[in-house]
Amino acid sequence: MNFGQALEAVKSGAKIYREGWNGKGQFVIKAGGYTVSESRPGSDYARAGIVGEFTIQPHLDLKNAQGHMQPGWVPSQGDLFAEDWLAEPVAE
């Protein structure tokens, strides 16, 4: 599938990845899109002085080959024009 189709899939809750990615086990998910009632004590938000209710806006996060989550993933030009995107449903 192309990136437009992959984007629609991830917006619907699937995890997406490219067949051609070298790092096996990598994938992208949609994260955020929810309201937090209060910052967790000790979190980066709390240390920045963010208090009260706030919204985490929807964004894309990458699980990289090392198993780390990288928030705010942005596709490369190659990713945008690739035709090797795949999607898998995730558990609810």
Which residues are covered by each model-predicted region?
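Short, compact, well-ordered microdomains
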Residues: 57-92
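Catalytic phosphate/metal-binding cores of nucleic-acid and nucleotide-processing enzymes, i.e., regions
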Residues: 1-52, 62, 68
